[in-house]
Amino acid sequence: YDAHEHIIIITSLQKSIKEKILEKLQISEKDFLSCDLIFTASEQAKIIGSEGEFLASKNLDNKAGCHAIMNAFVHTNHNRNKVIVFFDNEEIGSLTSRGANSKLLTEVLERIDHALNLEKEEHLIKLNKSFNISMDGAHGTHPGYIEKHDPNYQIALGKGITIKSNANFKYATTANGYAKLKLLAMKNNI
């Protein structure tokens, strides 16, 4: 946030946001310690394009990804343990206590295995056999701004999934994970 470049929310010339909250909650200032207050756009998602082929919405990558993962999770029939996690704070680097870079998932999985009376070695073997996918949206190549995209990686809209990778491991993709995803896509004609 840069105070010189970003808009400060103004809700009233008479009362501050804090005063409005106190009034709405009917509490005194001494009972108000702190809060996380997030403002967001309230526009509904819209189908756009001359053929109605585009969906325009805020946070679309996260919503579409979460929906696809949840749908697959619910409709997959096998007896293996399945875990899905939807982390918060992806847009700010996942560095919060509830973000993907936190200890939350590690601690939850350890507690589950502890409750199942698994030894530490059994827990580690289970983790080693697991497969992790980090889901995010990839920016499609805009025909009006070709120069803004890497010429070696043109991402076509509506042509399937994109697997992101980075030599500095900016993404969760490994060579093994890439191969598994590619085989899954080929097996399912994606």
What are these model-derived regions, one by one?
Residues 1-190:
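N-terminal hydrophobic/helix-forming segments and targeting peptides
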